[in-house]
Amino acid sequence: MKPIRCSDHARLQMVLRGATEDEVIVTIRSGKWETAKMGKFRTKHQFNFDKISLTNQKFYKYKTIEPIFADESNEIVVVTVKVYYSNEEVKL
């Protein structure tokens, strides 16, 4: 199993958008990889949240993490992380 490394940009986006490194790792390890732009990959995973979001101070039941990453020969490099908050469960 390849190690997962987050770029500086990905780490900053995780802080700003409310994702943790553990959530990103779980998402990459458990999700179905899809092709993204420029030879990268993406996947999504929905987590129970049941909290107030730090980004807009609203309550949400779910948080979906979407890392964009490169599958290199010796590691997986996370380029950026998108985070979506919702009150509806999504089938991924």
Predicted regions and their residues:
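Ribonuclease/tRNase effector modules and their secretory precursors
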Residues: 1-92
